[in-house]
Amino acid sequence: MGSIFQNKISINTLSPQPGIMIWYAKIPEITRSVFKKDAHPDLRAVLNELFKRQDFIKPFLSHEEINTINGFKALKKQIEWISGRYLIKQMIQNIFFSNTCLDQINLSYRKEGAPFLTTHPDLPVSLSHSNDYTAAACCKDKGQTIGLDIEKIAKAPDCFFMKTAFTQNEILNLKKDAAQIFRNWTIKEAYLKYIKKGFNESLQKVEVINNEIFHNKNKINVNVFSTFIDTDYVLSLVSD
């Protein structure tokens, strides 16, 4: 694990295997660093705000991205989106395109929700956020596939959530350990991103048992990486 201090943002870095990079940072640190003082949003607010490029200390969003942000109905969604975009753009610029301006690094989404770089669609990337953290992953090998998820660990979910998110076999293995429940959940969601289907695939068709993934009862040959952050967050990556 390493750290990059950039514009008063502490960016934590991981490399679970050669060629794969994970960055994660706190959303409040990002917002304090990217907005001009007089334009900093009130994070206690609920309704959305209409942002302009000049609200940011240094432009890093395109006009199209500003329009996307202003289409969201909740400020929380806007802030998560802005923070995630800032982190992954910094990552891509730092690792791949040091001479490219941040507002020229743009992402789009495939039909079922998987993100990709518009100018380099074959470069593997993945995004996630939860509460105070946003995370991004990329891979130097264009032939690899990755999926990333981060979640805040709360109390053990209720019975309805457990039966919706996990199979009976998974529930028997998980017991009532909140940390392991959320860890398995991040692995499952990371795998759904890995196959580029997200929640378009049934949660009951994917099982995580003893750190192994089964899809339609077939064991999947993938690498699974998980780590706990600040004792109350867990981050997982699924890769080739």
Predicted regions located by residue number:
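Core catalytic alpha/beta fold that binds nucleotide/phospho-ligands
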Residues: 1-240
